[in-house]
Amino acid sequence: MKIGVIGGGQLGRMLALAGTPLGMNFAFLDPAPDACAQALGEHIRADYGDQDHLRQLADEVDLVTFEFESVPAETVAFLSQFVPVYPSAESLRIARDRWFEKSMFKDLGIPTPEFADIQSQADLDAAVASIGLPAVMKTRTLGYDGKGQKVLRKPEDVSGAFAELGSVPCILEGFVPFSGEVSLVAVRGRDGETRFYPLVHNTHDSGILSLSIASTAHPLQALAEDYVGRVLKQLDYVGVLAFEFFEVDGGLKANEIAPRVHLSLIHI
């Protein structure tokens, strides 16, 4: 089997390192000339929206996946016309946009911090009046490793915050006094069979994941599996999905999902 991967970075590389011993071959589409995964398969150097090269990739492989959620959903939708793509374009559309993501959690009855859509400074002012401070403002898309977000602690932080984050669509989330952050990684096949990994406790340094410690018998494992299972079923998901939670008062509140392989699986 030959697998096409959108993105040739560290996660694509680790995906290939795991798949090669199983007899799988890989092709990576990535605009970077030094994409680190290229030593493990064919490197198609092209932008993610380059339809000619996307079609080339589709013609060469049996199926396509992606290593990170910053890939445009339109890219996945285009590829889906010619080759199976997992996870689906709809899964990516929701997971890459915090508003769609949080709205799905709410619809599925999964606890998540209070949130509001922000399209202007006036929206932000109204949301702060409703949700209160402290709160966290995040861009709806493209934020990662602490980027694309700002903590608002006092009224002076609110003025100009929308412009500070680039005057792009954002969400405002109520601040969560959490005791820890945990993540659960699940895998769901095309036949619906699902497997869950042990719940992992994550430690961050300046917004970047620095340490993940797995638990063999975490008291919140079953609850996390229930919440993740709801999302997998809703999206008819195929592939690997990571779900990050805040631990709050003996329960869990949803933070975000990642529709891909995840660094929290590299744990001790």
Model-flagged regions — what are they?
Residues 26, 85, 196, 253-254:
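Hydrophobic/aromatic residues located in beta-strands of well-ordered beta-sheets
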Residues 29, 66, 137, 173, ...:
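Active-site flanking residues adjacent to catalytic metal/cofactor-binding acidic residues
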Residues 32, 69, 140, 175, ...:
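Anionic group-transfer/hydrolysis microenvironments
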Residues 266-268:
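Conserved small/polar residues in nucleotide/adenosyl-binding loops
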Residues 236-264:
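Conserved metal-phosphate-binding beta-hairpin within the catalytic cores
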Residues 94-183, 187-234:
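Active-site nucleotide/adenylate-binding loops and adjacent lid/helix of ATP-dependent enzymes
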Residues 1-100, 107, 122:
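ATP-binding N-terminal substructure of ATP-dependent carboxylate-amine bond-forming enzymes
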